[in-house]
UniProtKB/Swiss-Prot annotation:
Record-stated family: Belongs to the Lgt family.
Entry EC no(s): 2.5.1.145
Chief location: membrane
This protein's pathway: Protein modification; lipoprotein biosynthesis (diacylglyceryl transfer)
Function: Catalyzes the transfer of the diacylglyceryl group from phosphatidylglycerol to the sulfhydryl group of the N-terminal cysteine of a prolipoprotein, the first step in the formation of mature lipoproteins.
Keywords annotated in UniProt: Cell membrane, Membrane, Transferase, Transmembrane, Transmembrane helix
GO biological process, one term: lipoprotein biosynthetic process
Residue spans crossing the bilayer: 11-31, 49-69, 84-104, 109-129, 169-189, 196-216, 228-248
Cellular localisation: Cell membrane
GO molecular function, one term: phosphatidylglycerol-prolipoprotein diacylglyceryl transferase activity
Record-linked InterPro entries: Lgt (IPR001640)
This protein's name: Phosphatidylglycerol--prolipoprotein diacylglyceryl transferase
Length: 250
């Protein structure tokens, strides 16, 4: 796949950045609708986004670099080069949520009211953003047979044929799962008024899908022999169950 979308003069604009931007824009449009459901201020949401989005990008990059530091030790300037990928979503979620918590505490606004509204937008952005991995030929799984990959559309087959071998399109599996979760979260946002349930459902459901999909990937970040994303996913599932149980109980 050609990772370059177009050029502006001598500057190459990559699909990775274009797709992340599209995901963010569509997430904001969805949030406009969801703010009306919860009667939350969209202006406040925009302010929150302007803090959360750059914080998430920084967090996603730092998280990735920490676990792959050997690749940057001899050329530290490359730490700042994200144009070819190298963003870890768990780092983005952690930094983004932390930034939002600090901002909303300063503004004396309800944290769970706004992250509930944000949850469908976040997972929508993740669903779209995974296609950036497709154009970068990354975040794929292990080798598969031609017979297996032939069940997918031709452009997926072409994109997953890398250096003479077909690979699991794990980016696609996660994208589809995230779209399904997004639809469910919008439904849940309409059905429940209990603050925190939608956001914690997002954490739990995303973690559930990511745990299984991560087992197929070939580019996992490791802590010893443990896949970090699977470890974080297990913690996310446990945390979401604990919080949802307590929210419903109280």
């Amino acid at each position: 796949m050609n990772p370059i979308a177009f050029h502006v003069g001598n500057l190459a604009i990559r699909w990775y950045g274009v797709i992340i931007s599209i995901g963010a824009a569509l997430g904001l449009l969805l949030a406009m609708y969801n703010c009306k459901i919860r009667e939350a201020s969209y202006d406040e949401f925009i302010n929150m986004f302007l803090i959360a989005f750059p914080s998430a990008i920084i967090g996603a990059r730092l998280y990735y670099v920490i676990f792959e530091f050997e690749d940057y030790r001899d050329n530290l300037i490359n730490i700042f080069n994200t144009r070819q990928g190298g963003l870890a979503i768990h780092g983005g979620i952690i930094f983004g949520v932390l930034a939002v918590y600090i901002y909303l505490k300063y503004r004396k606004e309800s944290f769970f009211e706004y992250v509930d509204v944000a949850a469908p937008s976040i997972i929508l952005g993740q669903a779209i953003g995974r296609w950036g991995n497709f154009f970068n030929s990354e975040a794929h799984g292990g080798p598969v047979t031609k017979e297996f990959i032939s069940k997918f559309p031709q452009f997926i087959q072409k994109g997953m044929f890398i250096e003479g071998t077909y690979y699991h399109p794990t980016f696609l599996y996660e994208s589809i799962w995230n779209f399904i979760v997004c639809i469910f979260l919008v439904y849940l946002l309409k059905k429940t008024k209990k603050k925190g349930i939608v956001f914690m459902a997002y954490i739990g459901l995303y973690s559930l899908g990511r745990f299984f999909i991560e087992g197929l990937r070939t580019d996992s970040l490791y802590l010893g022999s443990i896949r970090v994303a699977q470890l974080i996913s297990v913690l996310g599932i446990i945390l979401s169950i604990f919080f949802i149980y307590n929210i419903i109980k109280n």
